[in-house]
Structure formats: C-alpha cells, structure tokens
Design a protein with these regions (language model features):
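A glycine-biased structural micro-motif
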Residues: 23-24, 46, 76
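Amphipathic alpha-helical repeat scaffolds
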Residues: 46, 53-57
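Bacterial Sec-dependent N-terminal signal peptides
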Residues: 1-23
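A mature extracytoplasmic/lumenal domain signature
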Residues: 43-45, 85
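N-terminal "domain-start" segment that seeds a small globular fold
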Residues: 19-42
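Structural microenvironment flanking redox-active thiols in thiol-disulfide oxidoreductases
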Residues: 60-114
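Residue-level detector of conserved, well-ordered beta-strand and adjacent loop positions
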Residues: 32, 52, 114
Length: 114
C-alpha cells in the first residue's frame, strides 16, 4: 500500500503546475541592521553570503563564536556573514541595543546583525 501511495504522489507531482509567484528576487532584498543602517543584499554581489538566524538564549548560542571565526578568517576573501536575530521562539529577548551589546561583549562579534 505504501508503494502505491508513493507512486501516486510522484505521478501527481508530474502533472501539477507550480504556481510560485516571485515578487522579489533574493538580490533585491534588504535588511535593516541593528544599528539602523540598510543592508542591501545586492551590495554583496559576487560574494559568498551566509545569512544565519541567531538567538542569544538558545542551545546554539555558541554559533556566534564560530560565525565570528569564519567571518574573521574569510571576510577578506569575499565571505559575508549576516546574523538575523529572531525572537520567534522567545530566545532573543531584549532591545536591539541589548542584543548588540550581548553579542559584542560575550562573543566579540563585528559582523553585521539585523
């Protein structure tokens, strides 16, 4: 029965038309930095861009340290790291200033944060 269902799903996917509507290309996207400056993705054309969802109270908070190492080592070779804090899961509380201060004092980061 599982094989029949799987086969049906595969066949059905061939006959459906994707209707994705692209209103904006990734290169047209911009962020507002934690300092209030606009970060335009298009400014980083021809560079390797790493955009990472970050939070200062999650199990992966130490990723800040690794991201800073990556940024420090490869920024002169065209790597750009952008941290995007999100409080969707209640793991990034505080104001922009508190988040910025925490990241800079705890992990010494200097890559852009939104």
């Amino acid at each position: 029965m599982k094989k029949i269902i799987t086969l049906f799903i595969i066949m059905f996917s061939f006959f459906t038309k994707g209707n994705a509507q692209y209103e904006q290309l990734a290169s047209d996207f911009s962020f507002k930095s934690i300092n209030g400056k606009i970060i335009n993705i298009n400014d980083y054309k021809d560079k390797v861009l790493v955009v990472v969802n970050v939070a200062s109270r999650c199990g992966f908070t130490n990723q800040y340290q690794d991201l800073q190492k990556l940024w420090s080592e490869f920024k002169d070779k065209g790597l750009v790291v952008i941290g995007v804090p999100s409080d969707n899961f209640r793991q990034e509380p505080g104001s922009n200033k508190e988040i910025k201060d925490f990241c800079e004092t705890t992990f010494g980061i200097d890559f852009p944060i939104t």
